[in-house]
Amino acid sequence: MSLATLTVLGFSLSADAFAAALGKGAGARRPDLLEAFRVGAYFGAFEAAAPLIGWALGLTFAARIAAFDHWVAFTLLAGVGGHMVIAALRAPKAETAEASKARQKRALSPLRLALAALATSIDATAVGIGLAVTEVNILMACALIGAITTVVAAGGVLLGRGAGPLLGRKAEVLGGLALIGIGLKILIEHLSA
């Protein structure tokens, strides 16, 4: 598989991570460049590991994985997104600065980032299964996919950061709805295939 093909694959797989990171950036309290790359690294690491796992599983387990991967992705994304929406809607209208800071810090908690990254990378496992039957340097492919996703997701956080102050709490609601929408998209694509 050519470097150009792998690059296109990397950008394609990073689209869901970008959307999720956009919501994370909008719901967070002014994330800086370092924090944006920390978030990007979560998404990049999961996106790099998923094809490797899929490749290792190979074609033997393809039918078993395909039978439920979309449900796992949907459940994780809908759960994280739903929690973001509920938390934003339940937050008091006149929130103290401390309460606002704590809520926004939770948006970038390691657990929430890991769940969102896991959910957006499940499709990459199926891609890895497909890569098992092609001539590809799987380590190079995974490294490239991870690097692209890291940069794209970090960009999503920074773009979301700009939208966050303009939208206020609505940004967190929109971010949560975006995650739910990604989950629904994955579910519908797999159920209609």
Curated annotation (Swiss-Prot):
Topological relation to the membrane, as annotated: Multi-pass membrane protein
Membrane-spanning parts: 3-23, 39-59, 65-85, 113-133, 138-158, 173-193
Main location, first listed in the record: membrane
Cellular localization per UniProt: Cell inner membrane
One Gene Ontology term, aspect cellular component: plasma membrane
InterPro entries tied to this protein: Mntp/YtaF, Put_MntP
A Pfam family it matches: Mntp
Alphabetical UniProt keywords: Cell inner membrane, Cell membrane, Ion transport, Manganese, Membrane, Transmembrane, Transmembrane helix, Transport
Keyword ATP-binding: no
One of the record's GO molecular function terms: manganese ion transmembrane transporter activity
Similarity comment text for this entry: Belongs to the MntP (TC 9.B.29) family.
Task of the protein: Probably functions as a manganese efflux pump.
HAMAP family xref list: MntP_pump (MF_01521)
Descriptive protein name: Putative manganese efflux pump MntP
Species this chain originates from: Rhodospirillum rubrum (strain ATCC 11170 / ATH 1.1.1 / DSM 467 / LMG 4362 / NCIMB 8255 / S1)
Phylogenetic classification of the source organism: Bacteria, Pseudomonadati, Pseudomonadota, Alphaproteobacteria, Rhodospirillales
Recorded name of the encoding gene: mntP
